[in-house]
Amino acid sequence: AIVLTSSAGAGNQWYKDGAPIGGATATTLNITTLPGNSGSYTVISTVSGCASLVSVATSVTINPLPLVTPIVTPATTTVCNGSTVTVNVAGSQAGINYELFNGGTSLSSTTAGTGGAINLVTSALTANTTITVRATNPVTSCSVLLTGTSVVTVNPIPVTPTINPVGPVVVCEGTAAIVLTSSAGAGNQWYKDG
């Protein structure tokens, strides 16, 4: 809340945009930070039936936050170490910038909202990551995290396998079958000529 304080110890009446605020007669005025409470605030002190002049006005501007409701996908995904992830923000706001974060660390450049869906691409990920999306109004600097997140599991890259026997292998036609063995115990895919 924003707290305005009157120099008068008693008899205060607070005003917003020239209209008295009901029940606002204390030395301090607490203003909740909602955009509808933006305005010009003044105070008059009345003691023994005598009213002071109107105070100098204090202007209060409360800028709205970007919407937190655009949908973030994928909710979960799995990638290999060193890969990037493309995060889709559906229903972005025009005039709002979006950026991916992991905690306080930025994972992407900013992308301007269009009023529709936008894609943001992370930097290379090397560990399990919970991606959040920060929406920022570049004019007011007001920002908020979207409610949706993207949880990324990052799997390690296997060690490059070796082949036994080491080539080149040269035999005559009709020779018994050649058996090549991979050092990797699982997950093999063999290729010929590339």
Language-model features: locations:
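A short beta-strand segment in extracellular, disulfide-stabilized domains
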Residues: 1-8, 83-91, 170, 174-184
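Solvent-exposed loop segments of extracellular immunoglobulin-like
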Residues: 6-16, 93-102, 182-192
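Surface-exposed, flexible coil segments in extracellular/virion-facing regions
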Residues: 15-33, 104-120, 179, 191-194
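Surface-exposed, short loops/turns at beta-strand junctions within beta-sandwich domains
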Residues: 33-38, 122-128
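Short, exposed coil/turn segments at beta-strand boundaries within extracellular/luminal domains
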Residues: 48-55, 80, 138-147, 172
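Interdomain boundary/hinge segments at the C-termini of tandem beta-sandwich modules
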Residues: 58-64, 150-156
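Proline-enriched interdomain boundary motifs that mark the N-terminal boundary
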Residues: 65-75, 157-168
